[in-house]
Amino acid sequence: MHNSTDKSVKERFLDLLSEQFNTKEALATEIINLESILELPKGTEHFVSDLHGEFHSFQHVLRNGSGNVRSKINDIFQDTLTRKEINEFSALVYYPEEKLQLIKNSFSSKSELNEWYITTINRLIKLITYASSKYTRTKLRKSLPENYVFIVEELLYKSNKYNNKHSYYETLIKQIIELEQSDDLIIGLSFTVQHLVVNHLHVVGDIYDRGPEPDKIMETLIDYPSVDIQWGNHDVLWIGAYAGSKVCLANLLRICARYDNLDIIEDAYGINLRPLLTLADKYYDGSNPAFRPKNAEGLSELELEQITKLHQAIAIIQFKLEAPIIKRRPAFEMEERLVLEKIDYDKNEATLYGKTYPLEHTCFQTVDPNDPNKLTDEEADVIDKLLLSVQQSEKLKRHMTFLMQKGKLYLPYNGNLLIHGCIPVDEQGEMESMVIDGVKCYGRDLLDHFEEYVRIAFDHKDIQDDLATDLVWYLWTGKYSSLFGKRAMTTFERYFIKDKTAHKETKNPYYYLREDVDMCKKMLKDFGLDPEQGHIINGHTPVKEIDGEDPIKADGKMIVIDGGFSKAYQSTTGIAGYTLLYNSFGMQLVAHQHFNSKKHVLLNGADELSIRRVVDKELQRKKIRDTNTGHEIQAQIDILKELMHDRFVN
């Protein structure tokens, strides 16, 4: 009975498929096409990490493909163009709209401009021909400017072998110029180049954090042709807030206040902060130095005071909201983080981890020493209103939905493991376990459980105190969280305790064990990957190149690409971070210098890149056959061959 049911489902599937391929010839053509695609070189993967809301730096790296665009331009034009001309042409491909205006303004006559148009269009066609050489015509067509597909294809595939079409091709370009379509075409062709040099983008976590424009990054990613995301700790914080976690919401508001990024909340996402400001004005002092925003440049004294008050108000709400979760979830092992219960309010000191510290810069105006974790009625009302406003933001809904659709905690892809934070291990390198809903989880299984509960929380935004919603917050701050990767988050200590030893956050042993080849191979094997061929691509921790730290660890098994975009880390890293390229020939690590500005690139055309380092070179050029996409295509071929045998051979 079971077999006949299986067969009937299979038969129905083959029936549906045969409607699409209703002749032997149509089926054979598709099989030939797919088999041929498997033999093409694999496309270039581009890995970026820890964008931290820095839209302009991210956009530049995206537009130049971590130097890939410039590399292609050099390959073709290094013998025919000067360095200055290559710089000008590169800037045009990166920022076509703005560069076009600068160039047009530099010409004194229309005839000179028209000559430039002809030269530039021909150069772009030449560049696209080279950049698309490993793609099918169908794939290339999808990348071409929509309104000019016919014209561009004629120019791309032109053949004047018998000298019959010379004037035809000349007229095509002349008519483009005469009908004032040149600008649109050049802009479209430039974006085509950008999309061709990178086949797929991996964002290895933390789109959000202290930078001012994560919303613009999200809009860019939504429009990007092929992308996946591995959630970072800050991304999960925003997902949690939208999914109904008040404590996640309090945390992200506190971070925005700390770095003077409240514009993200109010202007970008339309969330009303007025109730919180009213509460803050009523209870808090605007001169508390511990709560002054880190980025105070350009703020008036009144604005500084307002943010300082708001910062205190939301921090206290956060500490109060953490307590009930810690108490109802003993498996989280976070009793030491019941910080408001650790305070002697008469002596103004706190006892944490067995040591007593004097407190400074305190702001406990709304804390009842007899019931320190209880929200006042005003605080409860404020956080309820804020959550409602967050969940009613259409823009935030769209961005968080995209994060869920394209995002995962980790991703095995083309033989490599992509993960933002860590795989929690103990000092001996054994996977650390955590009990979730009565089930002991560790390693890959632990991460799978975390992700499952994030999705449950997101699907049930109206429930705010279930295990799923609590676990989203745990991912932000818990000691067995793959995203946090430390034993405790010492936020309270950083605000109120002068002794810096209390601020220390001990990292999971993963962060020093990842230097070990055998450890990395073990992790790859645990995630179902070939330990000899695979790599772990890791974000989350800035690489302190200034102190001699190497982003390539464990004989190339571990590659750390974090620190690239957050300006706050650049003084400690010595660079503006790393991105990674993986094409059919192997992997290259790209180190980026500080991104000055778009204006600097437009005027000078110079990239803020340093020399690429080869991480791993393929002994044989990798084909699509060897990739995740190739395995999917092979599965399609197998089904089509079965249909051929079932319907046309017998």
UniProtKB/Swiss-Prot annotation:
<keyword id="KW-0464">Manganese</keyword>
<dbReference type="InterPro" id="IPR029052">
    <property type="entry name" value="Metallo-depent_PP-like"/>
</dbReference>
<keyword id="KW-0119">Carbohydrate metabolism</keyword>
<dbReference type="InterPro" id="IPR009164">
    <property type="entry name" value="FBPtase_class3"/>
</dbReference>
<dbReference type="GO" id="GO:0042132">
    <property type="term" value="F:fructose 1,6-bisphosphate 1-phosphatase activity"/>
</dbReference>
<dbReference type="GO" id="GO:0006094">
    <property type="term" value="P:gluconeogenesis"/>
</dbReference>
<protein>
    <recommendedName>
        <fullName>Fructose-1,6-bisphosphatase class 3</fullName>
        <ecNumber>3.1.3.11</ecNumber>
    </recommendedName>
</protein>
<dbReference type="Pfam" id="PF06874">
    <property type="entry name" value="FBPase_2"/>
</dbReference>
<keyword id="KW-0378">Hydrolase</keyword>
<comment type="pathway">
    <text>Carbohydrate biosynthesis; gluconeogenesis.</text>
</comment>
<comment type="similarity">
    <text>Belongs to the FBPase class 3 family.</text>
</comment>
